[in-house]
Amino acid sequence: MMRKFDSGPSVKSYNKLQNWFDFSKTGFIRVYSGKVDIGQHISSTLALIASKIVNINYEQVEIIRLDTDFTPNEGITASSLSVANSGSAIKAASITLKTNFINYALNQLNINEEDIQFENGVIKDKNSNKSISYWDYSETDHYKNTIIPEQFDEEVLKKVSYANNQKIELKNIKEIVTGKYKYVHDINFPNMLHARIVRPHLYNCELIKINEDFKKRLIENNIDLFVKGSFVAILSQDEFLAVKFSELAKNQIVWNENRKLSNDNVFNSLNANEKESLLVKPGGEAVNEKIPEIQSFEHEGIATLSSEFRKNYLMHGPIGPSASCAIYSNNKFTVYSHSQSNFALKQSISSYFNIDTSMVNIKFMPGSGCYGHNGADDVAFEASVLSKAYPDCHILLKWTRQDEHCWEPYGSASINKLFGAINDKGQIVYWSNEAFSDTYFSRPSNEELNNFTSFKFLNNDFTKIRSKPKTSAHMGIHRNLDPLYNFSKTRLVKNLVHDLPLRTSALRTLGAFANITSSESFLNDLAFAKNIDPFKIRINHLDDERAIEVLENLENTMKKSHAKPNNYRGIGFSRYKNSAAYCAVGVELNISDDLDIKLITAWITVDAGEIAYEDGIKAQVEGGFIQAASWTLYEEVLFDSKEIISKDWDSYKIIGFDNIPTFATNVIDRKGYPYLGVGEVVAGPTGGAISNALRDALGQRIKTMPFTKENITSELLN
């Protein structure tokens, strides 16, 4: 059977070679993409895809940073879709470029294909030494009018041979490790103003007054005070003074506290608060249908289990706080941002100022890297507001560490309630998983400008906005609630819980981390009930051969060694969104008498389709493992009725270098298959593997993350 290649959704909107390539720099191919570098080095992978197909050195390919004035709009850099969408588009454009260029050159040089020499973008006639290059070709109408097909058949693909698994140097890596790389925080323009926001201690505080003597002191020091509604900023050409006086201002302002945070235990609130419940169908779509009761079983030989798993609030915690630079000049905003969602940001800013979108240009400039909706959009919006008040002047606004920890939208706390039934043949005949959570979708938009945290302060409107449940397949709370496994009967329910205390939005994997961790833990508990091997119960409930191969590869790898005395092992598996890459994780850990958990070894097997860049895949899954391990073992946002307590790294614990395991990572190559997103695939399996290894160690399931001494002790005693 012929294997075809689909160009992906981006080509449907941008089907000209000119949408993807720029040949204005002699000797280099510059490639456009609508995806951005947020720590995953996607630009290196995209450059490699182009270079190996168009037959030019990797060093001669440059990825043009996103600019909303001219780069393709490929949506948010999220949901593990960068290589799947932008990578596929660039692959399609590269195939189209190469095949059309060869045909054009053969015609222009009047030679046969066996007579050409093709190196570094130049085709030469072996006999006459006449030549033509990509740069020559890019000037022709033939190039300018060429359309990228939406699909390629096998005959075309056979003509485009290329190698995989090349070793490359990441773009800009030398500058990054030597400190020469410029982030948005490092921007410096003549006469630029540095800004800091002065915030209250809590979300819903209205400005009452600012000390008049303090205002005079600001004037004496040539420092600007910007106030609109309850939005307060300090600005100075001297960054040190902006920082100093913004700190002093905190004690010079009187706020009215409109509403405290809920003092109740968040898990009590998740159970008790008003909620909207939707049934999740096989395939992952959520529908507004009657929720069936959990089925009862009284059949002989059927074992039933129920369990409840809990996850606390998590923060993004980027190593550098959010920042943005903006200027308003000639009736146009130019904003430098490290947001993942720059085209939506452009729309939102234009909507706030009631101007045409053409009057807002967002230029991506890297920050410290973050997966999800952190403070990047908020700070860009705030910088644009300040720039309007100071026309023709660049405003560089940096959040503080406390800003980032206390004002970013978190990943929601959640509960998963599971019930299952397994018969004597080891078949799971019934599976129920019910998820309870706040929203994972509160990105700002034209219609929801109040999702900018400062929009509320600018307008003194602290009305609590209720989110609406998302219904598309594997969206938000119910991402990966529908398992890949074949269970005889399933009951899957998402509950969007209202009036929870903290601001929440998209954090890496959305609800999938909690859903997969709880499912993989509960699956092991059902296996133990019938004394079934954890690998066997998973494989026996799968008919996807690629999923089975991933699990078998992990099993064979782990069998090459045995757990050392007092070490314990666990596994986890999923296919992210049931449509992205497949991933199986094994963990070996040790737990001390003091309940300190030490990660020893992590085995990871991943199938991401055709390998775009193997080292990049390994870096993504190993880095994703570390982040998920940190969530599982350490991280939780602490708060009380008055404030967020987790203001810094002392009060928000993360994994340290002393608990990074040894990695053994296998990437299965499926050359000719579609690229599958890999950025988020490892998180859920990691949580499941650690949970299962901990159960192996303790003989009891710990059901509240993070698995701290306090949570372990509490559950063991109860």
Q: Which role fits each region the language model picked out?
A:
Residues 1-718:
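Cofactor-binding beta-sheet edge motifs in enzyme active sites
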